[in-house]
Design a protein with these regions (language model features):
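Bacterial N-terminal signal peptides
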Residues: 2-12
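A cross-kingdom marker for long, charged
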Residues: 229, 236-281
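N-terminal carbohydrate-binding/catalytic regions of secreted carbohydrate-active enzymes
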Residues: 62
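Amphipathic alpha-helical segments of tetratricopeptide repeats
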Residues: 51, 220-221, 255-256
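Sec/Tat signal peptide C-region and signal peptidase I cleavage site
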Residues: 13-17
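Flexible, substrate/cofactor-facing loop regions flanked by secondary structure
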Residues: 225
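Short coil/linker segments at helix-helix boundaries
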Residues: 18-26, 33-46, 55, 66-125, ...
Length: 281
């Protein structure tokens, strides 16, 4: 997905999914470490969670998110998105992933998917399982689209993530992080040229750019783990829409919450000194 689905998890977690892990850190703490670019410590938090809750898919899928975020940081993926217009995105080069990180990323996703499907056979309305599968498909879409430049595969995973998100919202309407998957899908496809939108709709993916922004706003305001990521994606969208005040407000809030991440200070400076149109020099 163009803006990263990612990522990549809501207020609807079951009690098991938000328990404190053995070292006193929760999944919330793990995500805070990710947004502050402390990938090694986040990995340890997610491993601890898996040891405490071996049947819960959330630990593994969160670990996969950490691997993806680390690659985004190493390759400058999010930084590039702030000043890439749709034409330059289409012409982007395929990046060179770290083979070891890629293998660990997919291994974590396979583990999460296996645990999630196992839980769904026992309870089709298992919220953690549906959440993990929503996130897993979104992470695959991000990796395929933003790192490997496999656009068709990315759209396939985007559709998959949206389907899981809709199932999750049917179980619990207050799983606000699930709106990240559907919002990104709506925004990206709604931003495409009309003939491409038509072809994508034939494949069963709907598109409404403004609805996508509204769903991202919902996650940004009321989401849990993914609320900060939704704010990042919204800031990117606002830059592309040339809405500098909103983009700057979001980036300031992110800078203040995650001071160890230089991206936010850097992008505020670019907003203040560079024109909104075109790519960064």
């Amino acid at each position: 997905m163009l803006l990263c689905a990612t990522l990549v998890l809501p207020l609807c977690l079951t009690a098991a999914a938000v328990d404190t892990v053995a070292n006193g850190a929760s999944l919330d703490h793990g995500f805070s470490l990710l947004y502050n670019l402390d990938f090694a410590r986040a990995h340890q938090v997610f491993l601890s969670f898996q040891k405490e809750h071996p049947d819960n898919p959330m630990g593994a899928v969160c670990d996969a998110a950490g691997f993806l975020f680390s690659e985004f940081n190493r390759l400058g993926v999010l930084e590039a998105q702030f000043y890439a217009d749709d034409q330059s995105f289409a012409a982007r080069k395929r990046l060179t992933p770290d083979a070891t990180i890629r293998d660990r990323f997919y291994a974590a996703l396979n583990e999460a998917d296996s645990r999630a499907h196992s839980r769904l056979t026992k309870n089709p309305k298992d919220r953690d399982a549906l959440l993990a599968l929503t996130m897993s498909s979104g992470l695959k879409a991000d990796y395929a689209g933003l790192i490997e430049k496999r656009n068709v595969a990315s759209l396939h995973y985007t559709k998959e993530a949206t389907a899981w998100a809709n199932q999750l919202l049917a179980v619990d309407r207050e799983c606000y992080d699930a709106h990240l998957a559907t919002g990104v899908s709506q925004y990206i496809i709604g931003s495409m040229a009309a003939p491409i939108r038509w072809l994508v709709r034939l494949g069963g993916i709907s598109a409404d750019k403004q609805k996508g922004i509204a769903e991202l706003q919902l996650t940004a305001e009321r989401g849990h783990y993914l609320a900060p990521f939704a704010r990042i994606l919204l800031a990117i969208a606002y830059v592309r829409e040339k809405d500098k005040p909103r983009a700057r407000t979001l980036l300031i809030s992110l800078r203040d919450e995650f001071p160890q991440n230089p991206l936010f200070t850097q992008e505020i400076a670019h907003l203040d000194t560079q024109p909104l149109s075109g790519n960064r020099p």
